[in-house]
Amino acid sequence: MRRVVITGMGAVTPVGNNVNDMWEAVKTGKCGIGKITHFNTENSAVKLAGEVKGFDPESIVDKAELRKMDDFTIYALAAADEAVKDSAIDFGKEDTLRCGVILSSGIGGLTTIQRECLRGESKGYDRVSPHFVPMSITNMAAGHVAIRFGLHGMCTCVVTACASGTNAVGDALRQIRDGYQDVIVCGGAESCITDFGIGGFTSMHALSKAEDVNRASIPFDKERSGFVMGEGAGVLILEEYEHALKRGAKIYCEIAGYGSTCDANHVTAPLEDGSMAAQAMTEAVKDAGIKPENIDYINAHGTSTKLNDKGETNAIKKAFGEHAYKLAVSSTKSMTGHMLGASGAVEAIISALAVKNDIIPPTINYQVPDGDCDLDIVPNKARESRVDYAMSNSLGFGGHNASIVLRKVV
């Protein structure tokens, strides 16, 4: 069986606009959540989000081209640029039919959709931008990345809501492992911190209305009241192991297993018993050819909603039995907020660095224990501990569940 490894990573996040800055922030428990600046929140019940800060789009895309791209695509290009440079791969020397792209987004170009709807209402719908459709459709980040690097292999976009990023990584694993591709640029991107996007999730009672940044995104805390929206992108270069060795690539870790299921229960609410999320974890462990007790760390979906955190805790207990209480289980959304379709990719990067560096990120701002969430959530401070195997979970509206297993390469 062909093995699949990570040879490059890139990120744009609320806690850093590159992987190194993000990792330093995560290790030290830095909170990237703050007051919303993307729009006037005077009439919004939600005041906080995890915004990308200090990002210069003109460093990524020519000014003339910026008006043809939504922010989620620009974030994806920035993360992809970093990942490709980090991998030191020269696509000019590769068979580009064997090099593909799988990039996800949960919502796509919502900023563009909102702006052009308002333009249509005020000026007539024949006056919307000619770039409206290609800017807003969800697959365009993948298309732009393929164009930038001249990649002619499989190019797809996974849309499974907040599980999208993890499904993208998992699908890339299978494409390479099964021999269809040798290299895949994979991950996710999101940008929907607008009054329209925030309003939609607020109407669903999904977002925290807390105004204290230290008590807003608080996964597994008894006082949690909803998630905090984030934005950005995460991109990984997945590569067949022998292919990576042949070109002398550095290797972060191996993507060893993948599981994906559906609750088939409700459009937004997860199964309270976590049974299908547990099944995704079990499938990922089996796919990796290991035992449940081999897993050292789980980067949880951990959104800070009442239903998710309780259901995911139940799922981990179902999947791991008594070993669940020996695991470290943290949610880095306590720092980044919930980056929706980008979250799984960013958390795969964080999990890869946990494996490589033997450092387990914390769940910050944890104060009030919840008996329904009684696992070791690594409260408030990172932990140095051997991590041979990590798991990263993502769960999405529609009942989508996805888990990947990452293995140390020595």
Task: Please report, for each region that a protein language model flagged, where it lies by residue.
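Short, well-ordered amphipathic alpha-helical segments that serve as non-catalytic structural scaffolds
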Residues: 76-87, 141, 168, 239-240, ...
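Active-site-proximal alpha-helical scaffold in enzymes
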Residues: 76-89, 138-142, 146-149, 154-190, ...
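ACP-dependent fatty acid/polyketide chain-elongation machinery
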Residues: 1-65, 242-254, 349-364, 407-410
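Condensing-enzyme catalytic core mediating Claisen C-C bond formation in acyl metabolism
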Residues: 3-7, 30-34, 212-288, 297
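Glycine-/small-residue-rich "gating" segment that lines the acyl/pantetheine channel
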Residues: 122-129, 170, 174, 190-246, ...
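Phosphate/pyrophosphate-binding loops at sites that engage ATP/ADP/AMP, CoA/4′-phosphopantetheine
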Residues: 83-95, 244-249, 281-297, 319-323
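Acyl-CoA/ACP chain-elongation machinery
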Residues: 180-225, 258-272, 302-309, 326-376
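Conserved beta-ketoacyl condensing-enzyme motif
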Residues: 6, 22, 27-160, 189-198, ...
